[in-house]
Amino acid sequence: MQVDLLSSAQSAHALHLFHKHSPLVHCMTNDVVQTFTANTLLALGASPAMVIETEEASQFAAIASALLINVGTLTQPRAQAMRAAVEQAKRSQTPWTLDPVAVGALDYRRRFCLELLSHKPTAIRGNASEIMALAGVANGGRGVDTTDAAANAIPAAQTLARETGAIVVVTGEVDYVTDGHRIVGIHGGDPLMTKVVGTGCALSAVVAACCALPGDTLENIAFACHWMKQAGERAVARSEGPGSFVPHFLDALWQLTQEVQA
């Protein structure tokens, strides 16, 4: 297994492209992380929209640059809205990303996510336990937390990517991005990032946005992971704990975009 790495120059170019295109991201995400997710996208130069009403979700999925489906606070009415949005995204060729939160621990959301896979997501982003469960390798995880190392999920991620045609992202101490054949590893970040609710969910939104960019989708998604880890490292250096981390993290994302515009 060969794991490729990406250069800082490539990352900076991709971030410049991201800011230039300013993707409009339809975020059907969970209630806990909506504000943080929106602010993360804004800091990087994207435009978030949290449209969840069933009658509007399908309409908005047709005009958005990208769609995010995050099942963290899934309910039956929300599942209906998500289903409508995904079906419209498929018709409109809007790229969409699935974040299968806690899919290994809860049956209803696992069945729902497996149903959505038939609509061919552009990307899937989860921790090791979630990706392994979605691939049918194992069930588990402690709710939203993983009980497996990211590297252990690489074979499952490759299988899932080949079966669905999606780019699969396994996040952890090292993030891995694969299309079933190529694998890119992204190092960095800090353990403090796991002490703040929503960093993974926000990453999924950035991944969704990157699916709307021109060029190599796998590499663009890998850059999303790199930007988040890079901003996390900068934020931790200025923080005293989780409470002060969040504003420093948003500032760091913003500063990254300003640096590539200079």
Curated annotation (Swiss-Prot):
Entry binding sites for ATP: R125, T171
Positions of substrate binding: M50, G198
Keyword annotations of the record: ATP-binding, Kinase, Magnesium, Metal-binding, Nucleotide-binding, Thiamine biosynthesis, Transferase
Pathway(s) served: Cofactor biosynthesis; thiamine diphosphate biosynthesis; 4-methyl-5-(2-phosphoethyl)-thiazole from 5-(2-hydroxyethyl)-4-methylthiazole: step 1/1
Cofactors required: Mg(2+)
GO MF annotation list: ATP binding; hydroxyethylthiazole kinase activity; magnesium ion binding
Keyword Magnesium found: yes
Protein name: Hydroxyethylthiazole kinase
Family: Belongs to the Thz kinase family.
E.C. numbers: 2.7.1.50
Function comment: Catalyzes the phosphorylation of the hydroxyl group of 4-methyl-5-beta-hydroxyethylthiazole (THZ).
Gene (UniProt): thiM
Source species: Escherichia coli (strain SMS-3-5 / SECEC)
